[in-house]
Amino acid sequence: MRLLSSRAARVSGPSGSLCALLALLLLTPPGPLASAGPVAAVVRELRCVCLTTTPGIHPKTVSDLQVIAAGPQCSKVEVIATLKNGREVCLDPEAPLIKKIVQKILDSGKNN
């Protein structure tokens, strides 16, 4: 009977590939569950997204606007603007300029 060293030991057959796959899965770190920006990409935590808000922003710098209604995750309405440079900014939904921008978007949606 010949003993193999740990370096020379081999596992053959389907159980060897199964063990290798299992080892690979165990060693693979999980992917990110949320983005670093104010809005989570995959998982949204049960809390407010916006911790601080900006009272105004120039409308020409905004490429997208997202309004999150109050709900179980947050008791206040949140307005998040994605700027043309890719940054996301939380806006104050009570600011007069922001109210005008949101109303203009809502009105244009009704006309379509």
Swiss-Prot record:
PROSITE patterns: SMALL_CYTOKINES_CXC. It holds the Pfam family IL8. It comes from the Eukaryota. The keyword Acetylation does not apply. Residues 1-36 form the signal peptide. The keyword Transmembrane helix does not apply. GO terms for cellular component: extracellular space. CDD domains: Chemokine_CXC (cd00273). It is found in: Secreted. One of its GO terms (biological process) is antimicrobial humoral immune response mediated by antimicrobial peptide. Disulfide bonds join 48-74, 50-90. Induction: By interferon tau and phorbol ester. Its main location: secreted. Chemotactic for neutrophil granulocytes. Signals through binding and activation of its receptors (CXCR1 and CXCR2). In addition to its chemotactic and angiogenic properties, it has strong antibacterial activity against Gram-positive and Gram-negative bacteria (90-fold-higher when compared to CXCL5 and CXCL7). This is C-X-C motif chemokine 6. It comes from Bos taurus (Bovine).
